[in-house]
Amino acid sequence: MYINVFMSKYYISIDQGTTSSRAVLYDSSFNQITQEQQEFKQHYPADGLVEHDPEEIWTSVLNTVNSLMSKKDIKSSDVISIGITNQRETVMLWDKDGKVLDKAIVWQDRRTTEFCEELKAKGIESEAVSYTHLTLPTNGL
């Protein structure tokens, strides 16, 4: 299906954050028209562990986008582009068929604290930073 972007009128911004997903609709002059937000559950399976259900994340993104589009009766062909931000260094794994293997490990999780301290003690923190462009966390954060 061919979409003529010159006839399109809207931009969508998706902010998939640590506690909720938000979608914001802008007109072609970048004036905010409306927004939708949906929170999702935080899982704390043990002290220092923070996880999210990937399906809840995905559903919250879909719900917010669908809601703002239906609220203003906008078709996908009316959308010029979509920008997406996400929640820092949260990680999740999929199998080769795209099935989620487990809950997402949230950036606030402290299960790697001991490993990060070992890297610092070995003096290879700068090497880790050169690969990731992230500082090693202190106490897991």
Where are these regions (language model features)?
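Conserved small/polar residues in nucleotide/adenosyl-binding loops
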Residues: 132-138
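Carbohydrate-associated surface elements
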Residues: 109
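Active-site metal-coordination/substrate-binding segment of hydrolases
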Residues: 115, 119
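Structured, solvent-exposed acidic/aromatic patches
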Residues: 122
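N-terminal glycine/serine-rich phosphate-binding loop of ATP-dependent small-molecule kinases
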Residues: 2-103, 113-114
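Short glycine/proline- and acidic residue-enriched helix-loop micro-motifs
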Residues: 125-131
